[in-house]
From Swiss-Prot:
This is Pathogenesis-related 5 protein Cup a 3. It comes from the Eukaryota. SUPFAM superfamilies: Osmotin, thaumatin-like protein. Expressed in pollen. Belongs to the thaumatin family. One of its GO terms (biological process) is pollen hydration. GO terms for cellular component: endoplasmic reticulum; exine; extracellular space; Golgi cisterna; Golgi stack; intine; mitochondrion; nucleus. InterPro entries: Osmotin/thaumatin-like_sf, Thaumatin. The keyword Endoplasmic reticulum applies. Its main location: secreted. Pfam families: Thaumatin.
Length: 199
């Protein structure tokens, strides 16, 4: 499976992928990641405001992955995620479960499949208690309650909250909290994808 990751933002994005690593790329550039056969899942996200030295060590304002240019661990929250899982078919989503940093879209090459996007700038409407430098955090990450994190008593019955509704209203096709199962999409196995920052 091939992922073409494209930067349409008016600024540099340091893309990250598990698997895949990471890459600095400017507006208009593309980074291609080929997943090995049998790869069960992958996630991609964009990092902003990064500085790295010649050895690839440094830090990012949002989405930082342990201070490495080439990521081997998940990114720091908040970060808009493109998630992919392979089983009987492909399942994919744009996730705001870990918050939002930059707009993102997933475009399958199979045009019969849905192309979910989060094009809004959620940072512009982020409640002050969720606002952080470079992004808008999720209520679960900040408040850590079972209700916001869909844990314990809420594991099987976890309705949307006022916070997750802010994300959902801005980006109806994105996964807005842990139990927002309306926002996972399926496509035939063998499909390739492009992931676009600032679609």
């Amino acid at each position: 499976v091939k992922f073409d990751i494209k930067n349409q933002c008016g600024y540099t994005v340091w893309a990250a992928g598990l698997p895949g690593g990471g890459k600095e790329f400017d507006q208009g550039q593309t980074w291609t990641v080929n997943l090995a056969a049998g790869t069960a899942s992958a996630r991609f996200w964009g990092r902003t405001g990064c500085t790295f030295d010649a050895s690839g060590k440094g830090s990012c304002r949002s989405g930082d992955c342990g201070g490495q240019l080439s990521c081997t661990v998940s990114g720091a929250v908040p970060a808009t995620l493109a998630e992919y899982t392979q089983s009987d078919q492909d399942y994919y989503d744009v996730s705001l479960v870990d918050g939002f940093n930059i707009p993102l879209a997933i475009n399958p090459t199979n045009t019969k499949c849905t192309a979910p996007a989060c094009k809004a700038d959620i940072n512009a409407v982020c409640p002050s208690e969720l606002k952080v430098d470079g992004g808008c955090n999720s209520a679960c990450n900040v408040l850590q309650t079972d209700q916001y994190c869909c844990r314990n008593a809420y594991v099987n019955n976890c309705p949307a909250t006022n916070y997750s509704k802010i994300f959902k209203n801005q980006c109806p096709q994105a996964y807005s909290y842990a139990k927002d199962d309306t926002a996972t999409f399926a496509c035939a196995s063998g499909t390739d994808y492009s992931i676009v920052f600032c679609p």
